[in-house]
Amino acid sequence: MGKQQETILIIGAGISGLATSRLLTNNGIPNIVFEASTPDRSQGFAISLQEFGYSTLLAALGDLPLSSLIRAVAPDRQIGGTGWIDQALRDNRTGELLVAPDLTTTKQTIVRANRNALRHWIADCGEDELDVRYGHKLQSIKGKLGDVTAIFENGAKYKGSLIIAADGVNSTYSPRRGS
């Protein structure tokens, strides 16, 4: 009988935290995502995804088609849009087109994604549901690699094998890495 795999604790349910959780879950690796805010929080309107990023994500999620991503996350999807960015430069005052790539010879490589829609799409890209615990703001961490405990401001404590800090630039955990 094989040794049971320890749970990986992920701090932050933004795009990176959910993508990490989805990849781990799809590969049978137990994990829990902890998010300080509520499920209905906004994370900003949109993000631009470059081809090297979305193609890698689509491949990692099981060679999903690009059309699946675009249909789910393009900010203009509800009016038939595709989210593609034309990369044209316009005069801010007049709207006059200053420079634009020739789209008959230039491949479109940047797609705009609604952040909330992208988070939902990532969470739904698999057979198994992600385990996301909202209302869990990290307070402290005890232990070492292989045996860590995350302690949250709401009094909850969770043990795991390691912690992945995916809670952004104002990370609760990242400043503690050196200590």
Curated annotation (Swiss-Prot):
* InterPro entries named among the record's database cross-references: FAD-bd, FAD/NAD-bd_sf
Write down the EC number: 1.-.-.-
One Gene Ontology term of the molecular function aspect: FAD binding
* Cofactor or coenzyme needed: FAD
Gene3D superfamilies given for it? FAD/NAD(P)-binding domain (3.50.50.60)
- List, alphabetically, the SUPFAM superfamilies matched: FAD/NAD(P)-binding domain (SSF51905)
- One Pfam short name: FAD_binding_3
Give the binding site residues for FAD.
E35, A46, R119
- Describe the function of this protein: FAD-dependent monooxygenase; part of the gene cluster that mediates the biosynthesis of neosartoricin B, a prenylated anthracenone that probably exhibits T-cell antiproliferative activity, suggestive of a physiological role as an immunosuppressive agent. The non-reducing polyketide synthase nscA probably synthesizes and cyclizes the decaketide backbone. The hydrolase nscB then mediates the product release through hydrolysis followed by spontaneous decarboxylation. The prenyltransferase nscD catalyzes the addition of the dimethylallyl group to the aromatic C5.
What's the protein here called?
Answer: FAD-dependent monooxygenase nscC
